[in-house]
Amino acid sequence: MSVDMTKWCEIAKANMGKRPAGEGRLGGKICIVTGAAQGFGKGIAEELYKEGATIVIADMNEPLAKQVAEEMGKRAVSIAVNVSDEESVANMVAQTVEKFGGLDLMLSNAGVVRSGPLAHVEKKDFDFVTSVNYTGFFLCAKYAAIIMEAEHEADPEAMFDIVTLNSKSGLEGSNKNFAYAGSKFGGIGLTQSFALELCAYNIKVNAVCPGNFLDGPLWSDPVRGLFVQYLDCLLYTSP
């Protein structure tokens, strides 16, 4: 069941045209970046901040997210979120509107990976990847769009963005990494479908499909990173 966002829509509408412009190319823009406590998300959030945006560092790792926000500066705050949980995502968006008065950019970056041969990947791992990478993007886009559509009603000239950090694995298959690739292929379908629907509200929806970021947690995490998971795969293929 959807979370009622009526209160937050009214607040966002009332604040259109009243928010301070700020300095820089993104001065006055309010941005949520999920999975922003480390890796790609952190780097993106830092660059947006440098351009003048107000940033929400949204992440499950609340202590690290708080640290990143504090290091970034006064225009950054941290909010704990589980992108696979609808109420958590709705609360993240509501808190953003409560703190800053609206939302201009949702950057859905949070992602996980579980790799392995088809016969050995368990359903719980497949479901976990799907819930974060695919369903998580749906939920972030849904609740961002609810606010942005209300803001569009107040100011039909305003422009908004929803961006997902997809992957090269959303463009071609990935050997023994099908759960991740499948979720990213699905994300491309969501992106194109959302874009067709939301353009009527001046909401642009796009996906960025980067290659491997070997220093990021998806690869380098010592317990669940892809380096470790691919080494584990050798156990299944060695004679």
What are these regions (language model features)?
Residues 141, 183, 191:
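Active-site helix of classical SDR
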Residues 236-239:
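Conserved small/polar residues in nucleotide/adenosyl-binding loops
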